[in-house]
Amino acid sequence: MRIVLVVDMFDEENNGTTMTARRFADMLRQRGHQVRVVSIGESGKDKFGVPEAHYKLVTRISHKQGFCFATPDEKVFRKAFKGADIVHFFLPFPFERKAAKIARQMGIPTSAAFHLQPENITYNIHCEKVELLSVGFYRFAHRYFYKDFNHIHCPSKFIAGELRKNGYKQKLYVISNGVDDEFRPMEVEKVTDPEKFNILMIGRLSYEKKQDILLK
C-alpha cells in the first residue's frame, strides 16, 4: 500500500507522538509498504516538508514541551497524497484538519489516531483540577476534527474509554504504541544496598508525568 502519514513533527525524537509516528513508518516499510510523511522540516525521499506555524501564546507554551505546529500547505498535501491508498493522521490541529479536507476532496480514505491526551495540556497550564477543561477538549477535538473519521486508533484502553465517555461513536482500535526492538532485557548486577532502591522512569521529564510523586 501507499500510505501517507501526516504529523506536525517527525524529525525530532523528543515526544511520544513523534516517536510513535517514526516507529509506525519504520514497521510499515519493513512490511513492504511505501510510506510518505508530511511534517515540519526539509523535504527528501518520501518526506514532504513544510515550515513551522506560530500561534502567539500557544506556540510559546508548546515550545517548552519541545513541540512545534506545522503550517498547512495545500500544494504540498496534494503532491504528497497523489496516488495514495490511505492518509493517516496523529493529531487534531489545523495542519491535520486542512490535510484531511484535501484528502477527502481527492477521494482518498482517511484514518486518525488520538495521541493528545487533554490532561497533558491542563497539567502544563496548571489547571489539572479543572476537570471541565479536559472534558471540553475531548468534545472540541471531536467537533473540530474527529467527527469526520470512521476509524480512530487509541494507544490505550484509557483513551478509548475517555472517547466513548465523551461521545465518540466511531470504531475505536486500541493498539499499544509498542517498544523499539533496541530495548531488550539485559543481565546486569543489581544494586543490593538495603537503604536504597532503584527507580526506572521512561518518558519526558514533564509536570504531568508526576516524577515528583514517584521520588517522594
Place the predicted regions along the sequence by residue.
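Carbohydrate-associated surface elements
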Residues: 41, 158, 178
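Nucleotide-sugar donor phosphate/pyrophosphate-binding loop at the beta->alpha transition
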Residues: 120-144, 181, 185
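N-terminal subdomain of nucleotide-sugar transferases
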Residues: 1-44, 49, 82
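Acidic anion/phosphate-binding donor-loop and adjacent secondary structure
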Residues: 179-196
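Short N-terminal targeting/anchoring amphipathic segment
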Residues: 77-96, 108-113
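Active-site proximal beta-strand in glycosyltransferases
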Residues: 3, 86, 103-123, 153
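Conserved donor-binding/catalytic core segment of Leloir-type glycosyltransferases
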Residues: 191-215
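Membrane-proximal helix-turn-helix segments that form the acceptor-binding/catalytic region
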Residues: 105, 133-151, 166
